[in-house]
Amino acid sequence: MVEKGASDLHITTGSPPRLRIHGRLIPMTEYPPLTPADTKALCYSILTDRQKHKFEENSELDLSFGIKGVSRFRANIFMQRGAVAGAFRSIPFNIRTFEELGLPDIVKELAKKPRGLVLVTGPTGSGKTTTLTTIIDFINREREEHIITVEDPIEYLHPHKRCLVNQREVNADTASFKDALKYVLRQDPDIVLIGEMRDLETIQAALTVSETGHLTFATLHTNTAAQTINRIIDVFPPHQQEQIRVQLSFVLEGILSQQLLPNADNTGRVLALEILIPTPAIRNLIREDKIHQIYSAMQTGQERFGMQTMNQSLYDLYTKGLITYDIALGKSPLPDEFIKMVEKDLINTKRR
């Protein structure tokens, strides 16, 4: 898996193992289709007795583990058609830099904030954890503070550098995100990383931790900045939503909504990134429940504030030859707008 540069390995009955390479799922044809006995033996080979017992109770198990000199891995073991199956993701030991990920300088500025809420969003497999890991590593090298992470499971390991780093894993070091966040303020943190804002209690805790003067990072499975804001507010009952809009408008420092796309020659993947920086005008729009107007503010805030919409990011990658037109159009949240951007550029090119 690691030698072939695969991001994921899938093990299930009736198929040879399959590797995800640059987004495509490729069967390892040198192996025969796996039997139920094969998949159970392979998946159980990495489990402790305690983990085996928990899996047999729940039929689901999240975990992470490392192989010395090879890589760390995140795994999900599950049942399908009465047989054991597993999905494994490779987590490199080396943490990548902002430049290696293609993150703009404005993201580094978010890592320098003394307090507030920074959200990294996107679909599964879009690199949210990798982006957050790079941000946390930058803070770890640049600041002298206390970082607490709550993850399910722990993926990247952060050694103590200039910061003190405590990493807590759900179901190993704490019962749940909710329980960990209930006590986090008593642990004297400066920076808090929440692996995923899954429910009302976790979202409320993230807002409270941010509001009390801590820099807080979290992820959500949303595709755009505006959708992220709506998701946070809509989780709460109607009578609380006005209060949450006000609270969010004060604590929010940035939203990074990302996608990983195959590059133009299909030899790797590149990052497309929507960036929202809450200017005073955008904070007012959040408070006044005018979320639909935020997109226009982002379009005009690119040069001055470092913001960009997903279409602006896709267009930039396309004009640089990093992705194809078809990929850009297929991944655009507003394809008609993207087509007009390309047509406008063609007209301007002809006039020159």
Regions found by a protein language model. Name each.
Residues 1-352:
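Short, flexible helix-loop junctions that flank or precede catalytic/ligand sites
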